[in-house]
Amino acid sequence: MTSAVVVGTQWGDEGKGKITDFLGQNADAIARYQGGDNAGHTIKLGEDTYHLQLIPSGIFNSDKVSVIGNGVVVNPKSLVGELRGLADKNVDTSQLKLSDRAHVILPYHIKLDSLQEAAKGDQKIGTTNRGIGPAYMDKAARSGIRVADLLDKDLFATKLKQNLAEKNALFTKIYEVEALDFDSIFEEYYQYGQELKQYVCDTSVVLNDVLDQKGNVLFEGAQGILLDIDQGTYPFVTSSNPAGGVSTGSGVGASRIDEVVGVAKAYTSRVGDGPFPTELFDETGDFIRQAGHEYGTVTGRPRRIGWFDTVVLRHSKRVAGLTQLCLNCVDVLTGLKTLKICVAYELDGERIDRYPASLSELARCTPIYEELPGWDEDITGVKTLEELPVNARRYVERLQELVDLPLATFAVGPDRDQTNILKAIW
């Protein structure tokens, strides 16, 4: 029996889906435990490319159980759409399990998300306008609607009427926009619930049963640790806990978690606003963006690009208890003459190794870089560290030294067979 968490160590988009799919080959269950359909991940299998936002990456392993845990906020419309899309490509989804305790995103959450973001003006945080934050707000306020409620026609109607009365008052009196209609939302979303009913169960029982039977469980974190609402660059963060939310979001106790696998790119990217100390604004950043196809899976927005930041990685290692590191996109850096690694920050004339909580301090931080020579050789077929060109190997090993984590895998391309194992996780 082994349980492992796969979590992004930067600002999301690190390639967690690929690693989860790769590691999921030896797992008996794969589970999402936080976030919502703002967390796009891309899986490439042969000639087919799949873009998923809610369904765990493990769905492509038909003999595995795929779980959407209670900590996820679920847009039923998005989930039904994903399921239909997979069915169209003959992907078996019978092993999907949806927590009856997961909270539901409804149209008023999405509308409120957009209105709240627009009202912030220059202080906007870069939300994906998917209703994630407002859904978590309702959850904390104890007025949310859960999947179990969605399946109960009378209870769903009662709760929806109560919530719409409150939200429509906000829309008409505060934001001065049109109210939402109860009947259309109720009919549409109740039908979604009926379509999802076959997947709904107590997923905590499912996951703990797998562990009790000596099976392997892989937990898939969404976004990244620097987007964690507590440990990230607040308020430019998501509304959940990628770093430590696995137990509360899955119903599997902390004592049953064995490994925490951090995923990072060989550089850094970020979507949306917020601090980014190593951000590049020159042709080097453009080169990496183009070479790495750095555009958001969900939004299509160009990602911001920067050098690898070991201050960020050490922060992530500490707050999430990382035990191993998976390094992706090493091949993207091919062709750059010089590579830089941020090893510390300078703040008001002082060298610091911590990641500041204060946005004003972060704005005054200047990265301290270590420079390494780049490489021109094609590395997309490399299978071992020893096969890498000298400069590429030196770069990978230097990152590992600075972060002080064992390197479990390194990837030299998007395909499953381009992810190379250095240390077994299972």
UniProtKB/Swiss-Prot annotation:
It comes from the Bacteria. It catalyses: IMP + L-aspartate + GTP = N(6)-(1,2-dicarboxyethyl)-AMP + GDP + phosphate + 2 H(+). GO terms for molecular function: adenylosuccinate synthase activity; GTP binding; magnesium ion binding. Mg(2+) binds at residues 13, 40. Keywords: Cytoplasm, GTP-binding, Ligase, Magnesium, Metal-binding, Nucleotide-binding, Purine biosynthesis. Pfam families: Adenylsucc_synt. One of its GO terms (cellular component) is cytoplasm. Its main location: cytoplasm. Substrate binds at residues 297-303. GTP binds at residues 12-18, 40-42, 303, 329-331, 411-413. Belongs to the adenylosuccinate synthetase family. Plays an important role in the de novo pathway of purine nucleotide biosynthesis. Catalyzes the first committed step in the biosynthesis of AMP from IMP. This is Adenylosuccinate synthetase. The lineage of its organism: Bacteria, Bacillati, Bacillota, Bacilli, Lactobacillales.
